[in-house]
Swiss-Prot record:
<protein>
    <recommendedName>
        <fullName>Large ribosomal subunit protein bL20</fullName>
    </recommendedName>
</protein>
<dbReference type="InterPro" id="IPR049946">
    <property type="entry name" value="RIBOSOMAL_L20_CS"/>
</dbReference>
<dbReference type="GO" id="GO:0006412">
    <property type="term" value="P:translation"/>
</dbReference>
<dbReference type="GO" id="GO:0019843">
    <property type="term" value="F:rRNA binding"/>
</dbReference>
<dbReference type="Pfam" id="PF00453">
    <property type="entry name" value="Ribosomal_L20"/>
</dbReference>
<keyword id="KW-0687">Ribonucleoprotein</keyword>
<dbReference type="GO" id="GO:1990904">
    <property type="term" value="C:ribonucleoprotein complex"/>
</dbReference>
<keyword id="KW-0699">rRNA-binding</keyword>
<comment type="function">
    <text>Binds directly to 23S ribosomal RNA and is necessary for the in vitro assembly process of the 50S ribosomal subunit. It is not involved in the protein synthesizing functions of that subunit.</text>
</comment>
<dbReference type="InterPro" id="IPR005813">
    <property type="entry name" value="Ribosomal_bL20"/>
</dbReference>
<dbReference type="GO" id="GO:0000027">
    <property type="term" value="P:ribosomal large subunit assembly"/>
</dbReference>
<keyword id="KW-0689">Ribosomal protein</keyword>
<keyword id="KW-0694">RNA-binding</keyword>
<dbReference type="GO" id="GO:0005840">
    <property type="term" value="C:ribosome"/>
</dbReference>
<comment type="similarity">
    <text>Belongs to the bacterial ribosomal protein bL20 family.</text>
</comment>
<dbReference type="GO" id="GO:0003735">
    <property type="term" value="F:structural constituent of ribosome"/>
</dbReference>
<dbReference type="InterPro" id="IPR035566">
    <property type="entry name" value="Ribosomal_protein_bL20_C"/>
</dbReference>
Length: 118
């Protein structure tokens, strides 16, 4: 069998990793082994945290909705139940945005939900 020379492929693979490690401090941006470890870890964190971000934002929205709901004499769970009964299909992101930017609009929605609970 003929000998396989991998100079070009190996260099291209190493350069790809070093390019991803650009901007890292010290040896992590210069040495292939350190860069490989740093890039692997960074990509794992990025993958994980893209999912964690969704959880964090949902928790933030719920906290904001709950605070505004309590100002209107409802708990979060009763507000959501009332909205479902009133067939008001607003998601948590929009409700939280309303609670922060348009308290009067949120109060109107909360009153409709409250009316459905009576």
């Amino acid at each position: 069998m003929p000998r396989v020379k991998r100079g070009f492929k190996a260099r291209r693979r190493r350069n790809k990793v070093l390019k991803l490690a650009k901007g890292y401090r010290g040896a992590r941006s210069k040495l292939f082994r350190s860069a490989t470890e740093a890039v692997d870890r960074a990509l794992n964190y990025a993958f994980r945290d893209r999912r964690v971000k969704k959880r964090d934002f949902r928790a933030l929205w719920i906290a904001r909705i709950n605070a505004s709901a309590r100002e209107n004499g409802l708990s979060y769970s009763r507000l959501v139940h009332g909205l479902k009964k009133a067939e008001i299909a607003l998601d948590r992101k929009i409700l939280a945005e309303l609670a922060v930017t348009d308290p009067a609009g949120f109060t109107a929605i909360a009153d409709k939900a409250k009316a459905q609970l009576q």
